[in-house]
Amino acid sequence: MNTVKTGMLLAAMTALFMGLGFLIGGPKGAMIAFFIAAAMNLFAYWNSDKMVLRMYKARQVDETTAPNYVGIVRQLAQNAGIPMPATYIIDNPQPNAFATGRDPEHAAVAATTGLIKMLTPEELAGVMAHELSHIKNRDTLIMTVTATIAGAISMLANFALFFGGNRNNAGGLIGTLALAILAPMAAALVQMAISRTREYSADAGGAEISGNPLWLASALQRIDEAARRAPNEAAEANPATAHMFIINPLNGRGRDNLFSTHPATGNRIDALRRIAETMGSRSRPWG
């Protein structure tokens, strides 16, 4: 996402936040919400990556503690022409991964123990290349900031449902209930629509970085099947971060529609196979 789109999204999130503030405290509540949102946006810009990593209890590793995993990421970063990101492992049986950070110079990737144990080196390279594509395209800022703001909107909406103090104005009780319910839904829809488009782009970019689209295609199929059998309790507790992962960690079986955080896995695999056909002899083995 470019800077303009990032700014537009943050403005929309701020407007939702202010609307909920208005429900709770009228014009003064909206003004307070504006300053809170501005501070939150600034805080998220600098710290949301650390928050997400802490949320999932990710531990940083290096080539001494996780040589194969870190070595793969290092080679892929060189292929992509970006700085080596910090590498983390999450102790979770569900195979999954995400990238975070405000720019390529301050980025991190995290993979679960389930992912590292299950995949072949080629499949792991396909997944991590996808995550590095997010970093290279500067998607990671919008991923982490929207997760932070959307979560805050959901919490404030719940507060507005019980403590909304402006119910005699601007539509009364019905207006209060409508905005308190619709605001988090709108925030979620923004996340979902952006996530689906971004995932296709990262799949294509990752195929170029790794050199073989079929590695990621194979990994996605295996991850999708395994993720349905392995719940991710941390993600269930923090659903606003679901769009950050390579596969929906909430075990959803939704199709490629308005309410899905990720494109249908089958559609992604088909797209990768088409890319493989066009790459032809350019596809190369790992290592």
UniProtKB/Swiss-Prot annotation:
Subcellular location: Cell inner membrane
Single GO cellular component term: plasma membrane
E.C. numbers: 3.4.24.-
Alphabetical UniProt keywords: Cell inner membrane, Cell membrane, Hydrolase, Membrane, Metal-binding, Metalloprotease, Protease, Transmembrane, Transmembrane helix, Zinc
Residues annotated as transmembrane: 7-26, 30-47, 145-165, 170-190
InterPro entries, per the entry: HtpX_protease, Pept_M48_protease_HtpX, Peptidase_M48
Membrane topology (UniProt): Multi-pass membrane protein
Cofactor note as given: Binds 1 zinc ion per subunit.
Pfam family, one: Peptidase_M48
Location (main, coarse): membrane
Top-rank EC class of the record's enzyme: hydrolase
Binding positions (Zn(2+)): 130, 134, 199
Active site per database record: 131
Cofactor(s) recorded in Swiss-Prot or TrEMBL: Zn(2+)
Gene Ontology biological-process entries: proteolysis
A molecular function GO annotation: metalloendopeptidase activity
CDD domains: M48B_HtpX_like
Family: Belongs to the peptidase M48B family.
Protein name (Swiss-Prot/TrEMBL): Protease HtpX homolog
Organism for this UniProt entry: Parvibaculum lavamentivorans (strain DS-1 / DSM 13023 / NCIMB 13966)
